[in-house]
Amino acid sequence: MTNRTSLNGRCPVPFLQEDLFPPTGGFIGGRYCQPVGDISCCLPCPIVSWTYGDGLFGKASSASWISVAILPLCIFLLVSYAVLPVKFTHRHYLSVCFTLGICFMEASKIAFIIPLGVKPDQCYNQITPNDMHSSLSCAFTGSLLLLGGWMVVVWSFLRTVAFHLQVCWEVILGPKFMWGALIFGWVVPAVGLTVMLILTGVSFRFGTVCHINIDGALQDYWIPIISFAVAALILQLATMAYCIHVYVKSLFDTDSTTNSSGLPSYSASVRTVSARQAYRRIRRVLQLQWRGVTLVLIIIANVIFFSVTFIELDSSLKPTAENMEKALPWVACLAATNGDREKCDPEAAKFRPSEGLLLAVLVLLSLVGFWNFILFARPSIFHGWVDFFQNKFGTGDGRLEFVSADARTRLGDTRSYEMLNSTGLPSYKSPSPMVRSPSPARMGGTKSPENGHFGRDARYVRPSMSFSSPRPPSAPQGRGWDPKTTFAPAVYREYDD
């Protein structure tokens, strides 16, 4: 319950009279006001605390702390890609950029963590929320959130295109595709973010992270994001359908067993061989890229779910005549109870998205980095770090890889180490090695002057427990076989003529 103050003016409690506040500063479009007679009455800021209650902020903070725990996993992958050799990480520019996008995506990492330490003020005054122009924290967190969404969706689309080209069209991805993907994957999110910030902007709407404003959000952000996500999903499903088609074709195609003779024929089915080769090639590609395919499907499903949820939230909270008519019983309840939110919560639940759905979006946003770590943190990465630290501190085999076996003989008197010469013993010369190189006379008799091969016949020494002896070749010199009888006869079919 709220007490009356001078800012209520002629409006019933808990509403505040709009003309008692300055017309500039903060996000004016974020005010929730409705004309009542000759005045305009507004709900206090933040609006979410009235529609969902103060408990939503505590639950949203739990999702933020999940991101705090998952952020080191994302950083661990990026550091591994940068430090370890590729034989341990199997890094690829698609995976690296994808991981960078996930670190930014929907504030699941940095954008949720920064507000935990800063604790920005969500409201510019009692009825106006802060936006990117009045709050630096709002501009930073909102930009990271929306840039992460752009990057993840665009790189999901590029990974799907690469997978489709490799599987369905047998295209070998070279430098042209790499540079094209890098340009497309970074320029499109940058342009999309710039256009969105200029035309729409971000402001505090719920929680400590700024989200895109309602006006213009659909055409400036959600429609392009959903378009890329749906295109990636359709392309991914088409690729998987092609894989299933090739697999079924290789199972049920029996043309290779229709010949009556057991001998191979020149007229074997080329179509059967091609189908089986295509299946083996696709299987190899799937074995290499199943992690990326799985993560792309998870990301696309989450992005579509997020988009639908936020669009529903925008449509329900947008101050339109239809929404005001739906919210009229709730507004009347607040005026009758002097702003008792608990008593009016059943009326608010009739027009707002469910609280569980909104919290599910925040938790899923935080878990995206966890799925990325589970799928891309190969066991070889941990072996690579063990090898890295062993070589770093001199306990691994890599430190002795280029040490010569006779390095000790290059030194003089090794007893000088640790002051062993202080005993006064005379130094003795090390004995010369007993192994000597073959003499030129011996080497001259073992090589042929024509071609340098060994020309002397080796004398056969039969072992004591052997019952075999050298035998001359049994086959006569010259060709004793007819090549015509060793090849399979040609088989002719009626449709070959």
Swiss-Prot record:
Location of the region described as Disordered in the Swiss-Prot/TrEMBL record: 428-497
GO cellular component: plasma membrane
Phenotype seen when the gene is deleted: Leads to a strong increase of dihydroxynaphthalene (DHN)-melanin production.
Origin superkingdom: Eukaryota
Subcellular location: Cell membrane
Annotated InterPro entries: GPCR_GPR1/git3-like
Topology with respect to the bilayer: Multi-pass membrane protein
UniProt xrefs under Gene3D superfamilies: Rhodopsin 7-helix transmembrane proteins
Keyword Signal: no
Glycosylation, residue list: 3, 259, 421
Family: Belongs to the G-protein coupled receptor GPR1/git3 family.
Assembly, per entry: Interacts with gpaA.
The protein's name: G protein-coupled receptor gprM
Species whose genome carries this gene: Aspergillus fumigatus (strain CBS 144.89 / FGSC A1163 / CEA10)
Lineage: Eukaryota, Fungi, Dikarya, Ascomycota, Pezizomycotina
Gene that this polypeptide is encoded by: gprM
